[in-house]
Design a protein with these regions (language model features):
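A cross-family phosphate/adenosyl-ligand binding-site feature
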Residues: 1-405
Length: 405
């Protein structure tokens, strides 16, 4: 859904990053109109934003030319969302106190659209009690969402919190402001990625899972309001914003981390491509090729989904007060996808299972898109196709109904 975005730019060194943010918004189809504070113009010229948006830039409350084109009240009504990035300590203080002494703060008071605030400033300023109190005031204000700043080296040379997050993070939080919070108050546990089973210090058994589907599901659950923990095997993917990530390598490590957390969640969704077997006698040193045996003795890994199903899954009778998460598995099959997935769901004791095809041109391993089939109870299979981001959102929308039963 294309959004009408009013981007407020206040006067900090991070103002130059707003140019990249505008490009990202326009690229995905959003319509953007920029409003700048007087101090912001010391860092970036209005002409830059006008060139990027092909729209006039608001800089002063009583600019007759701008008011003739679109007045500040009309701009406030036009917006689907007001995004303040970067938000300086000064502008945050004005917002918290309800001040309206320039065009930007006037629009912020007049709009009934969601307001997304992305603070960016020196670490010591960000940590100051008054700034934190003002941010808390905004968090408690209806329709306001505060994006936490990144930590790292700042323009002033200090290291700490205060950096403006990258555009993908801001865009994800922008979308979250428009997402129905169907998972609000829910705790979700996901596994993702491959596992690696060591043969020796240089070799291991693994599979080509990229982890993209699991990470997309983590991001989508967070967007829908859930508190998300992601237990991840080795991947090259960035952690979705707001998601707690636990890194593991082997299937045994993943089993331990998942089982330790499952009792406290509402959904346990096992997306990881976990190795079924591991070398029985791994070496902690690299074994010379000349000394390696022609055969490799293997032993079974613990079955994470089966153990979840046995403890919490379908058909298990628990105490009335006992938390029992919805157990959802994934089945990667090369043939007879629906039938084999349905059998796996029953065998493992899962409440639901998501089936996808691997092998051949439609394999989902490492791909950007996917076609999956959701099997839940006696319901007819539901099929979802698209990018993994789109499929993840559709799966959660479908599963949200099962959480209400």
């Amino acid at each position: 859904m294309a959004l009408k975005v009013v981007l407020g730019v206040s006067g900090g060194i991070a103002a130059y990053k707003a140019c990249e943010l505008v490009r990202a918004l326009v690229k995905r189809g959003d319509e953007v109109r920029v409003v700048m504070t007087r101090n912001a113009q010391e860092f970036v010229t209005p002409l830059t934003f006008q060139a990027l948006t092909q729209q006039p830039v608001g800089v002063a409350t009583f600019d007759a030319g701008y008011e003739a084109q679109i007045g500040h009240i009309e701009l406030a009504r036009w917006a689907d969302v007001v995004l303040l990035a970067p938000a300086t300590a000064n502008t945050i203080a004005k917002m918290a106190q309800g001040m309206a002494d320039d065009l930007l703060t006037t629009v912020l008071l007049a709009t009934r659209a969601p307001v997304v605030v992305a603070p960016a400033m020196n670490t010591q300023m960000y940590l100051h009690p008054r700034v934190q109190a003002n941010l808390e005031t905004l968090r408690q204000t209806e329709r306001h969402l505060v994006i936490e700043p990144d930590a790292g080296e700042l323009a002033c040379g200090e290291v700490g919190a205060g950096r403006l997050p990258d555009p993908p993070v801001i865009l994800a939080e922008l979308d979250r402001a428009f997402s129905p919070q169907r998972l609000k108050g829910k705790r979700v546990l996901l596994s993702a990625g491959p596992t690696r089973e060591a043969i020796d210090a240089a070799r291991f058994l693994s599979n080509p899972s990229s982890g993209r589907m699991g990470y997309a599901l983590a991001a989508a659950a967070r967007q829908l309001g859930a508190e998300v923990t992601l237990v991840s095997g080795p991947t090259a993917l960035a952690t979705p914003y707001g998601v707690t990530r636990v890194d593991v390598v082997s299937a045994a490590q993943m089993h331990r981390e998942v089982m330790a957390r499952a009792a406290s969640v509402d959904v346990a969704m096992m997306v990881a491509a976990v190795a079924d077997w591991r070398p029985a006698h791994p070496s902690d040193k690299k074994v010379p090729k000349s000394q390696m045996a022609a055969t490799l003795e293997l032993e079974r890994n613990p079955d994470i989904l089966a153990d979840l199903g046995e403890r919490y899954g379908h058909g298990r009778q628990g105490d009335g007060d006992e938390r029992r998460p919805l157990v959802v598995g994934f089945a990667a099959e090369s043939h007879d996808v629906i039938e084999r997935a349905r059998s796996k769901c029953a065998r493992k004791g899962a409440h639901a299972i998501v089936a996808n095809r691997i092998g051949g041109p439609t394999s989902t391993f490492g791909a950007e898109s996917a076609t999956v089939h959701l099997l839940a109870g006696e319901d007819e299979p539901q099929t979802f196709s698209g990018t993994k981001t789109e499929v993840a959102r559709a799966l959660w929308e479908a599963l949200a109904g099962h959480l209400q039963r």
